[in-house]
Amino acid sequence: MNVCRVIAAALVCGTAVAQVPTAPQLPEQDRVLARQIFKEFIETNSEDSDGSVTAVCLAARNQLLKAGFATADLILAGPNDRKQNLVVRYHGAPGSKLKPILIIGHVDVVEARKADWTTDPYTFVEKDGYFYGRGTQDMKDGDADVVESFIRLKREDYVPNRDITLALTADEEGGKSNGVSWLLKNRPELMQAEFVINPDGEGPTMHDGKVTSLLVEATEKTYADYRLTATNPGGHSSEPRPDNAIYELMHALLKLEATPFPVELNNVSRSELEAMAKITPPATAAAIEGVLKTPPDPTAIAAFSKDPEANATLRTTCVATMLQGGRAPNALPAEATANVNCRILPGHSQEETRKTLVGIFDDPKLTVEYVADDGTTSPTAPNRESLPPPPLLPAVFEPLKQVTGQLWPGMPIIPSMVIGASDSIYTMQAGLPSYGIGGAAIEDTGNRMHGRDERLGVESFYNSVEFFYLYLKALTK
């Protein structure tokens, strides 16, 4: 999941617009059921190493079966026993010619060591106004939101104007069996849609108990690792050579440090910055306005780029993340390697970026290889350009404005570009416009996803359930 963006912090300096509601419209039976589903999801270990995504999907399937969903509309599919994905079909109006809406939600979680936590990460604990447990923020809350909303809509005999598909999937956080990718490749008929909603997006950001903004993740950078290698004959350390592999590697990395990629705005990042300029303090707004100029003002770029997250909004970033060299303390290194991790702007390929790195290093003795997800390397990278950002569809944003206006009056909705990664990258590569939209409001200082004692505010969770119920109805009227 994407980390909290600089925009959220900037908005704190503006005016908070609404108290977080306590979901007064959420019926008591739905509060009880949502908590029950959430608890069951949290207490089911779905780590890659020793957990089971299948077990979480079976728990969801059982809840939906009890609610009256047909077995044929609850499809388990995946590459192995632990990595079965669940695809749920909520049928729309008979004869509707509208394409389905696809909702994707990963049910795997990052590893959690019990010794690091003050509570058991796989025991659902409520204390001091929070729910604790691995996945409470990322993203079993969103999974529970949508499952409970499906059940509530079914109980109300609601008929949407089109089919709604929910895919609960494996291995977003890691592992070799990413569920969204697997379904798109092996069961594409289940993943047809006009657009995709991914609840793995950020929910409303809060400051002092009041919401400040809702970021809608409308495009993503592409992830890529490259292995930079320097080699030479090596030798005994008592006879140093001028062409030391470690030195050559470090010279190349210093060039990388000194050579940022060019600034490049797309329709989403430009919209995000335009919104920021209207609501941030004057100094920040002035820097943003300079960045938005054609051509951008170099002084403004330098000022705005001082914040790492702001910098990542403007350009492709590549950074050294791992080093390895030498085999013994008294031997010259015959080889030295570095991993360079890149987050690539939409519209550029991994191979284009690899070639750019080769140009930056400008040393024919070095090799720059692409590192695939399984750790294997190749001399070239995939050369398919990532798709440009999708349009900001009124079919997505108008219902969103309607619902947020009910729950958080006056809260700005700001399209944003994910600088991390989510499963939306797979659906966007498949040509499906995808939008990350979360419903759980989290304090700007309260982000614990992937960390110890992960937690989510109790009322933030219940309000998120209500948000998705209202949003699904607004999307399909």
Model-derived features: where do they sit?
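Acidic/histidine-rich catalytic neighborhood of metal-dependent amide-processing enzymes
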Residues: 130-131, 137-215
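Solvent-exposed loop/turn segments at secondary-structure junctions
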Residues: 47-49, 81, 94, 107-111, ...
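Acidic/His- and Gly-rich active-site-bordering loop/insert found
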Residues: 20-134, 153-162, 340
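N-terminal signal peptide c-region/cleavage motif recognized by signal peptidases
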Residues: 13-15
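Solvent-exposed, acidic/flexible segments
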Residues: 27-35, 46-57, 81, 136-139, ...
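Sec-exported extracytoplasmic/periplasmic mature domains
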Residues: 39-47, 61-70, 148-155, 188-189, ...
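Metal-dependent amide/peptide-bond hydrolase catalytic core
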Residues: 19, 201-463, 469, 475-476
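Sec-dependent signal peptide recognition
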Residues: 2-9
